Regions:
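Charge-rich, low-complexity N-terminal segments
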Residues: 1-111
Length: 111
């Protein structure tokens, strides 16, 4: 029976957010450096002649998927809750390139 192996690729990106309605300093716009670990579990490819022989996943493909799904959207973005008053007047989205309005409180736990 083949053994399942886990491989992990780590990514680092910077993002700003504000916690609307929070009674503390994090209600203000501030930023963090995030460390994202993407883990893929699978069986090592043992098919002779296959270009991915010996691999669970092609790290180049994993990097591209992570870039498309997460990094292009969140890296150097300002993330705000979509029902916060400052997200409705159009000022932030109109004056900054990467403002992402989300339907949840953009805390580290929710992200």
């Amino acid at each position: 029976m083949p053994t399942t192996v886990r491989v992990t690729k780590r990514f680092t990106f910077d993002m700003a957010h504000a916690l609307y309605g929070y009674d503390g300093p994090c209600k203000n716009i501030h930023g963090h450096t995030y460390h994202l670990s993407v883990t893929v579990a699978g069986v090592i490819n043992q098919q002779e002649g296959h270009p991915e022989l010996g691999l669970v996943v092609d790290f180049g493909e994993l990097k591209e998927i992570t870039k498309k799904v997460i990094l292009l959207e969140y890296d150097h973005a300002l993330v705000l809750k979509n029902d916060a008053p400052y997200s409705k007047d159009g000022f932030l989205p109109d004056h900054f390139e990467k403002v992402l309005l989300v339907p949840f409180q953009p805390s580290c736990e929710n992200l």
